């Protein structure tokens, strides 16, 4: 599995050229993309500026010597490469297994070309077998938890050891065990309109390419764009 993730990450790095501003994703597959960019900066003199999606990726990039800029200092990003926890047949996805979904979505939004790197196990018919992360403000989080419980979403607070995990943005994450999300777009809109929800892990209609690594090799899926 790790070998497949590495192949996907290294393949994505081939789309990066001199002078680009690039979004550096978070997670086990994006890790290999960032490593490969670091290698190219060091060995090939690749000139890029990175924008990171988590404190974890910031530390990784700094160690590798990748120059970084804050999201607030840029207007657009040429290319962002990130992982995904599930991708459905319509190229909607669930992200946030690494608890970085808010920063990931903020970086993805001004990106001209958004690429996901995954292994074949992440490609699914319907989203929802992977729990959907919902980032919520700490104030009123328990009340919101009860609302989700009443709606039948089977919520659970994301934990770190014995206490609730706190994200880089100082919020909690409630994971929803939905089983199958029949209409991710409608459910995304529902969560967008829920007071106390900062962001959710449904990335609908955002990705441009999905690089899938399997035992048979690497496939690059181009997402059809609505005309």
Curated annotation (Swiss-Prot):
Q: What is the uppermost EC class here?
A: isomerase
Q: Tell me the keywords, alphabetical order.
A: Isomerase
Highest taxon of the lineage: Bacteria
Q: Kindly indicate whether the keyword DNA damage belongs to this entry.
A: no
User: Which positions are annotated as binding substrate?
Assistant: 26-29, 82-85, 95-98, 122
Which InterPro entries does the record associate with it?
NagB/RpiA_transferase-like, Ribose-5P_isomerase, Ribose5P_isomerase_typA_subgr, Ribose5P_isomerase_type_A
Q: Which reaction(s) does its UniProt entry say it catalyses?
A: aldehydo-D-ribose 5-phosphate = D-ribulose 5-phosphate
Q: Which GO terms describe its biological process?
A: pentose-phosphate shunt, non-oxidative branch
| Pathway stated in the Swiss-Prot or TrEMBL entry | Carbohydrate degradation; pentose phosphate pathway; D-ribose 5-phosphate from D-ribulose 5-phosphate (non-oxidative stage): step 1/1
Report quaternary structure and partners. Homodimer.
Family assignment from sequence similarity: Belongs to the ribose 5-phosphate isomerase family.
What is the name of this protein?
A: Ribose-5-phosphate isomerase A
Organism the protein comes from: Streptococcus pyogenes serotype M28 (strain MGAS6180)
């Amino acid at each position: 599995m790790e070998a497949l993730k590495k192949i996907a990450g290294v393949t994505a790095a081939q789309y990066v050229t001199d002078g680009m501003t690039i979004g550096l994703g978070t997670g086990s597959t994006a890790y290999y993309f960032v490593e490969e960019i670091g290698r190219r900066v060091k060995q090939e003199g690749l000139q890029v500026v990175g924008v990171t999606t988590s404190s974890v990726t910031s530390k990784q990039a700094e160690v590798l010597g990748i120059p970084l800029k804050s999201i607030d200092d840029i207007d657009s990003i040429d290319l962002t490469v990130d992982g995904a926890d599930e991708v459905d047949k319509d190229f909607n996805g669930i992200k946030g297994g690494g608890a970085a979904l808010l920063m990931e979505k903020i970086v993805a939004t001004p990106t001209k070309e958004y690429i996901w790197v995954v292994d074949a196990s992440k490609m699914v018919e319907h989203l929802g077998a992977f729990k959907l992360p919902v980032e919520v403000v700490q104030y009123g989080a328990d009340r919101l938890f009860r609302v989700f419980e009443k709606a039948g979403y089977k919520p659970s607070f994301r934990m770190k050891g014995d206490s609730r995990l706190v994200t880089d943005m100082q919020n909690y994450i409630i994971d929803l065990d939905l089983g199958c999300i029949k209409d991710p777009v409608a459910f995304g809109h529902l969560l967008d309109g829920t007071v106390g929800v900062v962001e959710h892990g449904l990335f609908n209609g955002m990705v441009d390419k999905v690089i899938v690594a399997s035992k048979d090799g690497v496939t690059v899926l181009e997402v059809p764009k609505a005309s």
